[in-house]
From Swiss-Prot:
The protein, known as: Bile acid-CoA:amino acid N-acyltransferase
Quaternary structure (record): Monomer.
GO biological process: acyl-CoA metabolic process; animal organ regeneration; bile acid biosynthetic process; bile acid conjugation; bile acid metabolic process; fatty acid metabolic process; glycine metabolic process; liver development
Gene: Baat
Recorded catalytic activity of this chain's protein: choloyl-CoA + glycine = glycocholate + CoA + H(+); hexadecanoyl-CoA + H2O = hexadecanoate + CoA + H(+); choloyl-CoA + H2O = cholate + CoA + H(+); chenodeoxycholoyl-CoA + H2O = chenodeoxycholate + CoA + H(+)
Domain of life: Eukaryota
Tissue: Expressed in liver (at protein level); found in hepatocytes, sinusoidal endothelial cells and Kupffer cells.
Main location: other
GO MF assignments: carboxylic ester hydrolase activity; choloyl-CoA hydrolase activity; fatty acyl-CoA hydrolase activity; glycine N-choloyltransferase activity; long-chain fatty acyl-CoA hydrolase activity; medium-chain fatty acyl-CoA hydrolase activity; N-acyltransferase activity; very long-chain fatty acyl-CoA hydrolase activity
Xref: Gene3D superfamilies: Acyl-CoA thioester hydrolase/BAAT N-terminal domain (2.60.40.2240), alpha/beta hydrolase (3.40.50.1820)
Record PANTHER family: ACYL-COENZYME A THIOESTERASE-RELATED (PTHR10824), BILE ACID-COA:AMINO ACID N-ACYLTRANSFERASE (PTHR10824:SF18)
Role played: Catalyzes the amidation of bile acids (BAs) with the amino acids taurine and glycine. More efficient at taurine conjugation of cholyl CoA than glycine conjugation. Amidation of BAs in the liver with glycine or taurine prior to their excretion into bile is an important biochemical event in bile acid metabolism. This conjugation (or amidation) plays several important biological roles in that it promotes the secretion of BAs and cholesterol into bile and increases the detergent properties of BAs in the intestine, which facilitates lipid and vitamin absorption.
Phosphoprotein recorded as keyword: yes
Length: 420
């Protein structure tokens, strides 16, 4: 009798799962399916076909998928190859504290669609819990002064290295990365800056003094290890993160995921100074064959050619980790990172590391997250192409997440000796 097993049944989302099947007939072909519903009820699913060994077993750590949503030996392929049933939907975990993703794994006979319906009998099934928060992590709702967000603290007395987590142009408050970082020992502030609570409904300017308040708030907490803090940032959040690293002396480690090295669209304001956006070439905004907008060429005639538009990154005192998806269709991230590095090198600085991933897109998330290659965005019509190829993007997410943690611990905790 066929038996499906997975170890562990409950784990953090960035932890691998070992999936095996036993009790099959020799060389039997079976289908493995995975599905989950997000907090809004949107369905995501994947499937892969496997041939059993001569002893009737399938082991995803050893055996190659014959087809389906991926091919080859990929132990976590059922997770990162999931696709949304509703097109242009990004998998975002909103309730990180109380509910895990429940992933249904189903073992069944190979099936053939009949009149649009899937005809397949189940041989076995199980449910996995995938958490964004480890036991003992606490969440504190933050509404202090102008600051709005959520602070996640690891279990224990601390003090812990402090990190500010910044997302990009979607607005609102994203907590899933901060809660996961806290699960790995970082006191992490998920900081909203527009489209949340009583913050502005649209991002019209970047007030760096607001983010400075966020830094000071974090450093005041008794469980946060000073004297500096780190930044984990993506897209427009990375633009802000870079600006913070240059202007705020408390920033000692900055992770920039697919961000520009210049002011892209909204002016930055700090202590009376205004940093104006870089001119863009709207004629280079393109729409691909699927009707998705691509912005990555819009600064070809300005920032990509002339360093006068670039942030003076050489003035920063901290360290930088650039994470680049070379198939990013939203920003020319590889060019922007190389420009910033060239400025640092010209000033004789070696305070940078570059991770550049061929085939990875714009939205580089924690490990095993499904690739979101396109989605809807507030105030942007039509939808945006983020880029990325499924398998190399998944590899980039797994590798970069480990490197991000190493980098932050190295530069925020002087006594850290990498064991990752």
């Amino acid at each position: 009798m066929a038996k499906l097993t997975a170890v562990p049944l409950s784990a953090l989302v960035d932890e691998p799962v070992h999936i095996r099947v036993t009790g099959l007939t020799p060389f039997q072909v079976v289908c493995l399916q995975a599905s989950l519903k997000d907090d809004k009820g949107n369905l995501f699913n994947s499937q892969a076909f496997y041939r059993a060994s001569e002893v009737g077993e399938v082991d995803l750590e050893r055996d190659s998928s014959l087809g389906g949503d991926y091919m080859g030996v990929h132990p976590m392929g059922l997770f990162w190859s999931m696709k949304p049933e509703k097109l242009l939907t990004r998998l975002v975990k909103r309730d990180v504290m109380n509910r895990p993703h429940k992933v249904h794994i189903k073992l069944c006979h190979p099936y053939f669609p009949v009149e649009g319906k899937v005809i397949s009998s189940s041989l076995d099934s199980l449910i996995l819990e995938r958490w964004y928060v480890a036991p003992g992590v606490t969440r504190i709702h933050v509404k202090e002064g102008r600051i709005r967000g959520a602070l996640f603290l690891p279990p224990g007395e601390g003090p812990f290295p402090g990190v500010i987590d910044l997302f990009g142009g979607a607005g609102g408050l994203f907590e899933f990365r901060a809660s996961l970082l806290a699960s790995h020992g970082f006191a992490t502030l998920a900081l909203a800056y527009w489209g949340y609570d009583d913050l502005p409904s649209r991002l019209e300017k970047v007030d760096l003094e607001y983010f400075e308040e966020g830094v000071e708030f974090l450093l005041r907490h008794p469980k946060v290890l000073g004297p500096g803090v780190g930044i984990l940032s993506v897209c427009i959040g990375a633009e802000i993160g870079l600006s913070m690293a240059i202007n705020l002396k408390q920033i000692t480690a900055t992770v920039l995921i697919n961000g520009p090295n210049f002011v892209s669209s909204n002016p930055h304001v700090y202590r009376g100074k205004v940093f104006q956006p870089t001119p863009c070439s709207e004629e280079f905004v393109t729409t691909n064959a699927l009707g998705l907008v691509e912005f990555y060429r819009t600064f070809e005639e300005t920032a990509d050619k002339d360093s006068k538009y670039c942030f003076p990154i050489e003035k920063a005192h901290g360290h930088f980790l650039f994470v680049v998806g070379e198939d990013d269709k939203n920003l020319n991230s590889k060019v922007h990172a190389k420009q910033a590095i060239a400025q640092l090198m010209k000033s004789g600085k070696k305070n940078w590391t570059l991770l550049s991933y061929p085939g990875a897109g714009h939205l580089i998330e924690p490990p095993y997250s499904p690739l979101c290659s396109a989605s809807r965005m507030p105030f942007v019509i039509p939808s945006i192409n983020w880029g990325g190829e499924v398998i190399p993007h998944a590899a980039a997410q797994e590798h970069s997440w480990k490197e991000i943690q190493k980098f932050l611990k190295q530069h925020l905790n002087p006594g850290f000796n990498s064991q990752l």
